Design a protein with these regions (language model features):
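Short, compact, well-ordered microdomains
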Residues: 75-81, 173
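Acidic, gly/ser/pro-rich intrinsically disordered tails
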Residues: 1-42, 46-52, 85-99, 108-117, ...
Length: 214
């Protein structure tokens, strides 16, 4: 998963196809000595960012943040999670984005809701001091199915938003996933007891063997 932060100048008006807003921009700064990078911004029209894209006019400048992929034509295609302009600069101060890496914890079943499904599953990471941090991820829809089916210990990068909730006078952190990337296992030898499927646990030794060099 590639999340880019780019300063852009809009070069054309927004187009809409099949419910998706499409805007062409170029990287800043642009000059005669430098070939600007062409960036295609795409987002659903009913999404908050999609509505903002529709209002952008040619020659407007903005800051765009979101998952990005290159094309064979030398264009970057971004699905922006945040667009910041001079008019909505306060949105940058209110940015809510987490990126967590680690190994998936014990399997968890999908829960059926009225119009979708949700899976709540832990993600664990161990630092150099052998301290393990656990993040309880919540994924909906197609991401829910993926999160429910993968084996414990699967190397994972999760991107989304963090929020808080309270129950019985206790505060909980919630990590709602927008994007998930599952990585291939490291070529390093993983301990035989890295994942105890019978007990549904992931050992910290397994987490330490995961290579997240991208």
């Amino acid at each position: 998963m590639n999340v880019f932060t780019l300063g852009l100048r809009i070069t054309g008006t927004a187009n809409e196809t099949d419910g998706v807003v499409d805007v062409i921009a170029e990287s800043l700064p642009a000059s005669d000595r430098r070939v600007p990078t062409k960036v295609q911004l795409k987002q659903k029209k009913d999404h908050y960012v999609g509505k903002l894209l529709q209002s952008l006019e040619a020659d407007a400048t903005c800051l765009a943040i979101g998952p990005t992929k290159p094309t064979l034509d030398g264009v970057l295609v971004m699905q922006p999670m945040l667009i910041v302009t001079k008019e909505n600069f306060d949105d940058l101060l209110a940015i809510n984005l987490f990126m967590a890496t680690g190994g998936l914890g014990p399997k968890s079943d999908e829960i059926e809701l009225d119009d979708t499904t949700v899976t709540n599953r832990s993600l664990a990471w161990q630092n150099d001091d052998k301290e393990t941090s656990w993040f309880k991820l919540s994924a909906f829809g197609e991401l829910s199915k993926q999160l429910a089916e993968l084996a414990p210990g699967t190397p994972t990068i999760a991107v989304g938003k963090v929020s808080s909730s309270t129950k019985d006078e206790k505060t909980y952190l919630n990590y709602t996933v927008d994007r998930v990337l599952y990585l291939p296992k490291s070529t390093r030898s993983t301990p035989k007891k890295a994942a105890d499927t019978e007990k549904g646990q992931v050992t910290t030794a397994a987490l330490g063997s995961i290579d997240f060099s991208l």
